[in-house]
Amino acid sequence: MPYRLVKQVRGNEVLRKSFMELAMKTFSLNFRRWCEDGYWTERYIPYVLADGDRVIANVSVNRMDMLWRGQAKQYIQIGTVMTDEAYRGKGLSKFLIETVLHDWKDRCDAIYLFANRTVLDFYPKFGFVKAVEHQQSFSLAPQPGDFQKLDMQNERHRQLLLDCYHLAN
């Protein structure tokens, strides 16, 4: 394959910027603020193919610690699967998914993804099976209280959220 495989672009400014541009172009997904605010950690691992300094395809690994029936588990969520329009039809996503599955099959308890309708026939080629999703909703009446909406642009508010998160995990 004439393209370069890179298994993390967080520390590479040129490839990180190109990854973000492809995500915006493909999904209108803006990673810039998420990255600048410190939420992009070593647990989010883009596997990219680069043509020079340009990211042309990506499959991301998101390492997630879960508690399932009282047991600690490490799951891998695959996401941000994308290929630049000019490079589609060359098997780049297939190569990246196979690489991710090879790298992680013995290092986690399960691998999963969420697929939109346009790619439901693509993922079974890699052993993924369709699962029924459930969504529950209910109405809530407003409750009086001294609640404060957090502003994620405010450093103190972000730190408060992280402190609460760490207390529960």
For each predicted feature, which ranges?
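Conserved acetyl-CoA-binding loop-helix of GNAT-fold acetyltransferases
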Residues: 83, 89-102
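Conserved active-site tyrosine of GNAT-family acetyltransferases
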Residues: 123-124, 128
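Amide-forming acyltransferase catalytic core, primarily the GNAT-like/NAT-type
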Residues: 129-169
